[in-house]
């Protein structure tokens, strides 16, 4: 609802601007045309609350995603409308790629914009949330793909060597060297690559992914400062050990938790 309130506030300012530009010279029809503009909101995707793919085990997650949503037809203008969908976060991108985008594309939009209220989730959590494997994160997959695209895959090897070197350190001396994976790229470059990765083959609509940035997230919730899965700045030394170990597991194709 916050997004709709914000867009409506913008639209009211736009209406005011257009009316002022008329300098008092307007007809009733013209005024009505300006005032009648509104934001279209529809419940297009209806979620089955009994199904939750995020907490499903890896083996069964993929087969569940196709059964989570149903849609409403006859609302979207074919090859004209842009659909803006809001997600609280994008962790793996599994549901987007295997379910949501395929379903929404059948409605015929020209473009689908996915807006994540959370920043890019780049690092594992080790304080209670089930996000422990680097290779699962779509943001990490995007960064690795960008290294391959740009001929900088050697940096992945360098980060691995640094992780191995620190693995025997006392945890108080370990630093999060996995940050280097993301450093060469802007947030926009990673977001664009994520859009490529989550777009299923065969869909017609253009796909755009927009993430909340970390600075604005802190501005929105100043009393909640835990951001390590976005920033990599862990509040305890053990967090750095976990992220480096998670990268070692990824590099060695070891499919297990880092803690």
Name the predicted role of every residue range.
Residues 1-259:
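PRPP-associated nucleotide enzymes
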């Amino acid at each position: 609802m916050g997004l709709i309130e914000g867009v409506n506030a913008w639209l009211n300012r736009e209406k005011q601007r257009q009316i002022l530009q008329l300098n008092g010279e307007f007809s009733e029809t013209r005024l009505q045309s300006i005032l009648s503009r509104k934001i279209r909101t529809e419940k297009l995707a209806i979620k089955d609350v009994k199904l939750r793919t995020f907490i499903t085990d890896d083996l069964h997650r993929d087969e569940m995603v196709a059964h989570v949503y149903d849609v409403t037809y006859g609302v979207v203008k074919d090859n004209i409308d842009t659909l803006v969908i809001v997600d609280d976060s994008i962790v793996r991108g599994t549901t987007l790629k295997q379910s949501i985008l395929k379903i929404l594309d059948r409605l015929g939009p020209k473009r689908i914009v996915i807006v994540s209220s959370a920043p890019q989730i780049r690092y594992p959590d080790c304080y209670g949330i089930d996000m422990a494997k680097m290779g699962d994160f779509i943001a990490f997959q995007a960064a690795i793909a960008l290294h391959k695209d740009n001929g900088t895959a050697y940096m992945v090897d360098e980060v691995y060597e640094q992780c191995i070197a620190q693995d025997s350190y006392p945890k108080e001396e370990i630093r999060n060297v996995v940050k280097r994976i993301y450093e060469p790229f802007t947030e926009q470059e990673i977001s664009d690559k994520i859009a490529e990765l989550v777009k299923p083959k065969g869909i017609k609509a253009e796909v755009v992914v927009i993430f909340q940035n970390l600075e604005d997230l802190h501005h929105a919730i100043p009393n909640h400062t835990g951001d390590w899965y976005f920033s990599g700045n862990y509040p305890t030394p053990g967090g750095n050990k976990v992220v480096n170990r998670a990268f070692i597991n990824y590099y060695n194709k070891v499919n297990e938790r880092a803690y």
